[in-house]
Regions:
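FAD/FMN-dependent oxidoreductases across multiple families
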Residues: 129-196
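Predominantly flavin-linked oxidoreductase catalytic cores and closely associated redox partners
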Residues: 7-155
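A conserved beta-strand/loop capping segment in the N-terminal third of enzymes
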Residues: 1-4
Length: 196
């Protein structure tokens, strides 16, 4: 999805540099800035700006460089997810919908069908809940699927395309959302969701 958006921006004339790393940002008194960037070959170059909008997502460039990180007020949540070859996907519209099975106020299962026939499935819940299941990540995710009355039969026994990934305590926060010369947006500001 991000790649589709990036390509459309390039089509509309926006300059986007891929595989470049922001290594430093210096802000002046008036809010203007000088950003040091390293390209894919390690060459350093600089960009001067009146304002910076940080949409770096979970990379959280400005929060990291400006020491803006702070613990999240959101309770500790974790996730566990994988992709499967969705051999029992329903025909018609239902098989194309991104859906959630909310097990309780703190726990849900996502089901995200891809056009290639694979589906991303994953649980988000309190870390205590995620950690309550025993075994390796495959055994844990299979056990969790038993808690979904709606999706259990569809995904029971299907092989995972890769060993399920577990991400613990993924929520992040910042001390402030903006300052002189910059603003944080999206997941660089307050990261709530796991990668799926």
């Amino acid at each position: 999805f991000d790649n589709v958006l990036a390509k459309e921006l390039v089509n509309r004339g926006v300059d986007i540099s891929f595989e470049h790393e922001v290594v430093d940002v210096i802000f002046n008194e008036d809010g203007t800035s000088k950003t040091s960037i390293k390209d894919e070959e390690g060459n350093l170059y600089f960009v001067h700006a009146k304002h910076i909008i940080d949409s770096s997502g979970y990379g959280r460039v400005l929060p990291r460089l400006l020491d803006l990180d702070k613990p999240s007020a959101i309770p500790e949540h974790s996730s566990i997810f994988a992709h499967v070859k969705d051999s029992r996907r329903p025909d018609g519209e239902e098989g194309t919908l991104i859906t959630f099975d909310v097990l309780d106020k703190d726990t849900w299962l996502w089901v995200i069908p891809f056009s290639n026939g694979d589906t991303s499935i994953g649980f988000v819940g309190l870390t205590e809940f995620i950690d309550s299941f025993e075994g390796d990540t495959s055994e844990r995710l299979q056990s969790m699927l038993k808690h979904s009355k709606y999706y259990h039969d569809r995904f029971e026994g299907l092989d995972f395309n890769f060993p399920p990934v577990s991400i613990k305590n993924f929520s992040k926060s910042v001390k402030q959302l903006y300052g002189k010369g910059y603003a944080l947006t999206g997941n660089s500001a307050e990261f709530l969701d796991p990668v799926f």
